[in-house]
Amino acid sequence: PILDGGPCTIGIESTIVDLTQEQPAILRPGFIGQHDIESIVGPLGTSNTVAPGTLRSHYSPMTSLLLSHEPELERQKLETEGRSVAVLRAQETPQYARNLYAELRKMDEMGVDILIVEPAPNEGIGPAINDRLQRAAAKFSTD
């Protein structure tokens, strides 16, 4: 059985920080950002440790997902090619984080050929949102 706790207040998973080394490192970005962590522990280092939710392809919908800073231009181009498209525009970052997975699931259920998603601004919780979006798009990426 699956329990439905209703909508969540934050949306994306927590920040994971490695405190086992001399210099702490973020293993997975989340709601608590780098600036907030550095204000407590000082400058952060890097780590090669694998944490939950950090595989290259993760959080992926079934439908191809394209990240674009120009989603309307991409939509027009793809629709001209005869492709059916759904677009998710960036929102205020707390709202975007809170609704991200629900929006991706809803768009996935639409049965379109491609989901075009606009990345979040790269500030506050934006890097964590973009981390999840890059992972969601990774299995469809050619790089």
Residue ranges and their predicted role:
Residues P1-D143:
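Active-site-adjacent structural elements in enzyme catalytic cores
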